[in-house]
Amino acid sequence: MSREQTLKLYLADLKKDYDYILIDCMPSLGMLTINALAAADSVIVPVQAHYLPLKGMTQLMKTISKVQRQLNPNLKIDGVLLTLADMRTKLARTTEDSLRENYGKHIRIFKTVIPVAITAAESSAAGQSIYEYDKNGTVAKAYAEFTREVIQCGEKQRNKHESSLSR
């Protein structure tokens, strides 16, 4: 067993008990992220609405491609989620435009944008989910909308798959 496959082996037993298993990684390309990509069926890439995270997309796409070639040929990218976005700023709007222009033809860029809000940091510091901490706030509402968007995309993919099987 290679060290890149450790998480995949661990999750193999759990998969039968869950519809979804979410693996949240730090924004680095270390061994934990490689393990997560090797174990995942699909990946949602969060990108902060700033210059450097957008530039890091190139490296991440190379890493995902390498993982697909060497460890997990079935890994697919479900989409990119813009996060920590203050859409009142030119930087955030430019980042979104650049993301959609440079990647949107090949990768789904989710419509939902997660706004920047101090409540997100406060909920983490309090050890609570955003829904426990500020369930009616803009961040919680955005994540709820994002969840609906992901489920809707999954249903479309499942229906497409089922219709291709019935032919």
Give the predicted meaning of each segment.
Residues S123-K141, E145:
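C-terminal boundary of histidine-terminating zinc-finger modules
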Residues V47, L54-V80:
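Anionic-ligand binding region
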Residues D13, T33-Y51:
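Inter-motif core of Ras-like GTPase G domains
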Residues D86, D97-Q128:
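Beta-strand-loop-alpha "switch" segments that mediate conformational coupling across diverse proteins
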Residues M1-I23, S28-L29:
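Cytosolic-facing regulatory segments adjacent to core modules
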Residues S163-R167:
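Non-Sec secretion/translocation targeting segments of pathogen effectors
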